[in-house]
Amino acid sequence: MKLLSGLLLCSLVLGVSGQGWFSFIGEAVRGAGDMWRAYSDMREANYINADKYFHARGNYDAAQRGPGGVWAAKVISDVREDLQRLMGHGAEDSMADQAANEWGRSGKDPNHFRPKGLPDKY
């Protein structure tokens, strides 16, 4: 636990890089909200083959907030995938999820992963 806390703190300090703390933290909080909204939409949609789209969309929306949002999206995505691996989900699917996460975080259009027929609401 101490190691994880230390890594998160160091990651946060390095992520700020001269930018104001309050701005960075605000971006991170709003970015985490974007990630939660994408996750909630994914659960609500319950649409086959849509998970990569929601991964990319959550990361994209969070990254649009700024460096704090990028940081939050990366931390949340990495922790989620690590937990999935620990619970026995396939490494291949995890790698595909991480590719979608990075796609969105880098500012690329998440609709690249949007499956045909997914309701316009999402």
Curated annotation (Swiss-Prot):
Swiss-Prot/TrEMBL keywords: Acute phase, Amyloid, HDL, Pyrrolidone carboxylic acid, Secreted, Signal
Sequence intervals crossing the membrane: none
Modified-residue entries (Pyrrolidone carboxylic acid), positions: Q19
Localization terms from the record: Secreted
Extent of the signal sequence: 1-18
Region Disordered: start-end pairs: 90-122
Similarity comment: family membership: Belongs to the SAA family.
Function: Major acute phase reactant.
Known partners and oligomeric status: Apolipoprotein of the HDL complex.
Name of the protein in question: Serum amyloid A-2 protein
Organism: Oryctolagus cuniculus (Rabbit)
